[in-house]
């Protein structure tokens, strides 16, 4: 499958040779503040009950709507947009986020969770939006710990104590 968005040849090569194609499903969350759909791509729909927040890329179209309601975060969003895409996606890079004050509703259980803008979410991968399950994903876990977000386990080991993130 072709990548959209004029990616540098280096990124295209990494996608083809290292990352490979991701298989998963699209889940549609509802944005509470403007009653619009926010599709997210996930490879682990089995963890949907552990979603404690959602994150969109700074280039995501919903960000324009958020900025109309909250112009105070515009400079922080612009700084994220101006970062190098390879740097943003780098393994081990600290993840940075902006709390939008908005929420999305989990379509499986109706729970409303905060919506963030994150520099590590890329618009040209999946839908540009992530359902965050910090108990079962290392990136989500690091982000949740940094910003003191809820961590909810939904998968447990057969024996012993759970060590987070349990992936």
Which stretches of residues belong to each language-model region?
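Short, Gly/Pro- and small/polar-rich lid/capping loops
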Residues: 4-26
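Non-cofactor substrate-recognition interfaces
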Residues: 1, 23-167
């Amino acid at each position: 499958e072709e990548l959209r968005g004029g990616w540098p040849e280096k990124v295209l090569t990494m996608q083809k040779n290292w990352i490979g194609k991701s298989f998963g499903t699209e889940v549609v969350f509802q944005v509470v503040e403007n009653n619009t759909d926010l599709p997210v791509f996930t490879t682990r729909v089995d963890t949907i009950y552990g979603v404690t927040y959602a994150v969109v890329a700074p280039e995501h179209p919903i960000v324009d709507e958020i900025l109309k309601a909250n112009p105070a975060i515009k400079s922080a969003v612009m700084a994220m947009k101006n970062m190098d895409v390879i740097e943003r996606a780098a393994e081990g890079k600290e993840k940075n986020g902006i709390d939008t004050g908005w929420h999305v509703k989990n379509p499986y259980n109706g729970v409303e969770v905060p919506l963030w803008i994150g520099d590590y979410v890329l618009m040209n991968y999946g839908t540009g939006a992530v359902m965050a399950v910090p108990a079962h994903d290392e990136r989500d876990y690091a982000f949740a710990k940094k910003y003191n977000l809820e961590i909810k386990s939904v998968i447990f080991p057969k024996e012993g104590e759970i060590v987070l993130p349990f992936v």
